[in-house]
Amino acid sequence: MMNPRFFCPEGLVPDCEIALPLAVAHHAERVLRLAVGDPVVLFDGCGGEFAATLTALGKQPLARLGPRLPIEQESPLAITLVQALASGDKMDWVVQKAVELGAVAVQPVAAERSVLKLSGDRASKRVAHWQQIAVAACEQSGRNRVPVVGEILSLARYLALPAEGTRLILTPGAAGALARKAAPQGPLAVLIGPEGGWSAAELELAERAGCEPLALGPRVLRTETAGLAALTALQTLWGDFSGDSHV
């Protein structure tokens, strides 16, 4: 059974005793019912992880760290999921599963047909919430590098950013298909539309910005399904689901 894993955002130092963040200690003691002497795994997002032992709990929680272990669970394929805002708790689900499926970043975008509208403090709080979901997904899935959930951008603002690698935009009926593409030579970004799909103007804007339109089969997928299906397909073709590391 895997030892409980916790993210500690402060840089961890090998072979020493550290103060645990209170939120980590609360989860360990109150939720998981761990006790002094129990083994845990700590990671700081800088790569690798530490086998550690709880040495004190309560108001001044401590853990004794061993050496940094060079363990990584990252895919050779660097995929950013560019997800149009979706209503309800769909974004929570998408962020969690995207991290489990190996995305290196999640970029929320406000689309013309997005039901969810966020701005100002509400937007900042929601992004912080999604970032915590990404942290929890790393703790659960064994990843030691936490994907960044970006601030909410308009589609136009996102497309104006310098493109790093290939950008794919999913839309039903597109002529392009993943299986006919050559293996990418760098990072990938996959753009997923909202509940009502991308508008014609958005598709035109994306294509002018160099995005390649693709369809995932003959069926219309829900927004919370499409990105995860795309991530799974990409990891199977060229990532760590393929058993190959040629990317």
Per-region residue spans from a language model:
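Structured adenosyl-cofactor binding patch, chiefly the S-adenosyl-L-methionine
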Residues: 200-247
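N-terminal positively charged helical leader segments and presequences
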Residues: 1-70, 121
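RNA substrate-binding interface of SAM-dependent RNA methyltransferases
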Residues: 72-168
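Residue-level signal for inorganic ion chemistry
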Residues: 37, 98, 134, 206, ...
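Glycine/charged-rich beta-loop-alpha catalytic/anionic-binding loops adjacent to active sites
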Residues: 18-20, 76-80, 186-189, 208-216
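Active-site/ligand-binding-proximal alpha/beta "capping" segment
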Residues: 162-203, 212-215
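Short, ordered loop/turn segments at secondary-structure junctions
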Residues: 11, 68, 110-114, 218-219
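Generic structural signal for residues in well-ordered beta-strands
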Residues: 40, 63, 146-150, 213
